């Protein structure tokens, strides 16, 4: 191999040729590459080396970065960050405890006392903790920035959230459906009666002045909202009821009935969600002629007759809980004595029991005489 310069190009580049060792012929030499002369580059490097202040500035910058790195490194090493609330307190990123006098020694002492295993965390794990801490601080700052706008919106609503947009399942009242039924068609079986759910509508009983009574037809014309309740009554009840043209009292079955006190006790919203309550209100019979109809309606429904005629129970309630067969009936006892057929049986053979009064045959005979004057239950059908 030989280096040779040609003419004017000798100052700019070198020509590299490859020659065989056996022969000295120059024609066999092959040009491999032309290398530029490095003289201009050498001159530039010599000029750069002459001004010494530039390397000194770089060294000073590197030293400043190293000092800053040393200053921040202990916080990243021991995972200590500032409080996101802006109070300036130093908090541990692992447990959230406050470090009173923040320094490398106090942070290390805290870690050794509370969670010494965090000293063995890898740099990648520490970087993940630092990143999560910074994201949490940014999120908290965004939430605090949005909080002042919330009271201004709630001020127009008196500080109460909208129950429609944000319903609370715990505070939502239970859905309770109350049905007020006059039981005007007792001839139908219980299973065939309609059980459609309707919203609670308590009809208001009209106030009747005793000094100014009007005929029945005129009162129905003036209060048309009460007319459907009259149309619902069956023929069976209208045949037996007293056809007195005088306006009946509010306790009469022909008048619109009000919800008894038991209904209002079930509408306080104390039931769990999904609870459906159905209540059927019965009215109280007024005249003695209507007492047989009450007994006849019970006989048509197949209900047992109450055995205590002297007790006075409130208007009847019959409730069903969803689809469960739970029925509660508190029927009003018939005013007619249940011993109306007692006169057919001989009374002389009966003796006085232990708990009976000595004059009970006399009471039974008086009761039988009273029943004979009453019409039979099936005479009106």
Swiss-Prot record:
The modification Phosphoserine is found at residues 122, 149, 249, 252, 310, 313. One of its GO terms (biological process) is DNA damage response. Residues 148-170, 203-270, 285-320, 335-381 are annotated as: Disordered. Residues 304-315 have a biased composition (Low complexity). Disruption phenotype: Mice were born at the expected Mendelian rate and are viable. Mice are however slightly smaller and display reduced levels of poly-ADP-ribosylation. Moreover, they are hypersensitive to ionizing radiation-induced DNA damage. Keywords: Chromosome, DNA damage, Isopeptide bond, Nucleus, Phosphoprotein, Repressor, Transcription, Transcription regulation, Ubl conjugation. GO terms for cellular component: nucleus; site of DNA damage. It is found in: Nucleus; Chromosome. InterPro entries: SPIN-DOC_Znf-C2H2, ZnF_transloc-Spindlin_int. The keyword Cell division does not apply. Residues 148-158 have a biased composition (Polar residues). Residues 219-229, 288-299 have a biased composition (Basic and acidic residues). There is a cross-link at residues 49, 190, 221, 291, 295 (Glycyl lysine isopeptide (Lys-Gly) (interchain with G-Cter in SUMO2)). The keyword Ubl conjugation applies. Chromatin protein that stabilizes SPIN1 and enhances its association with histone H3 trimethylated at both 'Lys-4' and 'Lys-9' (H3K4me3K9me3). Positively regulates poly-ADP-ribosylation in response to DNA damage; acts by facilitating PARP1 ADP-ribosyltransferase activity. Interacts with SPIN1, SPIN2A, SPIN2B, SPIN3 and SPIN4. Interacts with TCF7L2 in a SPIN1-dependent manner. Interacts with PARP1; promoting PARP1 ADP-ribosyltransferase activity. This is Spindlin interactor and repressor of chromatin-binding protein. It comes from Mus musculus. The lineage of its organism: Eukaryota, Metazoa, Chordata, Craniata, Vertebrata. The gene is Spindoc.
């Amino acid at each position: 191999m030989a280096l040779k310069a040609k003419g004017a190009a000798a100052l700019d580049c070198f020509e590299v040729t490859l020659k065989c060792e056996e022969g000295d012929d120059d024609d066999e030499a092959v040009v491999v590459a032309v290398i530029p002369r490095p003289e201009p580059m050498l001159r530039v490097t010599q000029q750069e080396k002459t001004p010494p202040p530039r390397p000194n500035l770089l060294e000073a910058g590197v030293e400043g970065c190293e000092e800053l790195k040393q200053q921040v490194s202990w916080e990243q090493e021991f995972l200590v960050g500032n409080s996101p609330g802006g109070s300036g307190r130093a908090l541990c990123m692992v447990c959230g405890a406050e470090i009173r006098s923040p320094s490398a020694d106090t942070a290390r002492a805290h870690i050794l006392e509370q969670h010494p295993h965090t000293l063995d965390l890898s740099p990648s794990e520490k970087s993940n903790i630092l990143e999560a801490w910074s994201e949490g601080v940014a999120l908290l700052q965004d939430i605090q920035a949005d909080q002042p706008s919330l009271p201004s919106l709630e001020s127009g609503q008196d500080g109460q959230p909208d129950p429609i947009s944000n319903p609370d399942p715990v505070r939502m009242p239970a859905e309770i459906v109350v049905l007020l039924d006059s039981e005007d068609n007792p001839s139908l079986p219980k299973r065939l009666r309609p059980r459609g759910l309707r919203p609670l509508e308590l009809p208001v009983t009209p106030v009747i002045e005793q000094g100014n009574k009007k005929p029945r037809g005129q009162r129905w014309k003036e209060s048309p909202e009460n007319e459907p309740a009259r149309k619902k009554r069956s023929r069976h009840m209208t045949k037996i009821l007293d056809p007195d043209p005088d306006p009946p009292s509010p306790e009469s079955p022909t008048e619109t009935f009000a919800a008894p006190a038991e209904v209002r006790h079930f509408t306080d919203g104390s039931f769990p969600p999904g609870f459906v309550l159905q209540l059927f209100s019965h009215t109280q019979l007024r005249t003695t002629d209507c007492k047989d109809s009450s007994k006849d309606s019970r006989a048509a429904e197949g209900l047992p007759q109450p055995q205590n005629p002297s007790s006075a129970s409130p208007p009847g309630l019959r409730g069903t809980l969803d689809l469960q067969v739970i029925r509660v009936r508190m029927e009003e006892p018939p005013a007619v004595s249940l011993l109306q057929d007692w006169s057919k049986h001989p009374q002389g053979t009966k003796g006085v029991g232990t708990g009976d009064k000595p004059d009970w045959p006399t009471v039974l005979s008086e009761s039988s005489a009273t029943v004979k004057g009453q019409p039979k239950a099936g005479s009106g059908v």
